[in-house]
Amino acid sequence: MSLLSRTFQLATHLVPSQRTFSTTLGMTEKATFAAGCFWGVEHMYNKYFKKDGITTKVGYIGGKVDNPTYKQVCSGATDHAEALEITFDPKRVEYAKLVEFFYNMHDPTTLNAQGPDRGTQYRSAIFYHSPEQKEIAEKVTAEVQEKHYKGKKIVTEIVPAGVFYDAETYHQLYLEKNPSGYECPSHFLRW
């Protein structure tokens, strides 16, 4: 058995399942956030965290239909949220920092809406991939509620990550590929 095989076996045996073994022998984790239109969410995370080595993809999570299409999700009938899945190296960027940024770049006090976008597919949600992520998300949420949203209630759902379905190819990195097109008016830094 090669050293790489033994290392992989050891790494996958000792770490929680939400972590994956990268080709650079480092561990990566996933973070999944819903905060309105996924184009704007992806654009904001890439703008501020690409330098930290994150990779992103947009898709659908939290619904009751397998392999939903954009049209189905937009109808509101599938219960999916438009979401961003981030793969990150926790040695380069901490999960807590990604969660705090999530609250900074959208309005977590509006139920099933962000700016002009309305419907459950635009809800504010953190989909955690481990008990540790849940604990961190709850702690950061309480801190942000106290510090930034006194008098307004954060309505963000903190729920287990289920199956994430990749959105259609044309949605991936949409605002990067269409820089003079639509801008998401609800995604900006609030503090």
Q: Model regions: which residues?
A:
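Flexible coil/turn and secondary-structure edge motifs
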Residues: 2-191
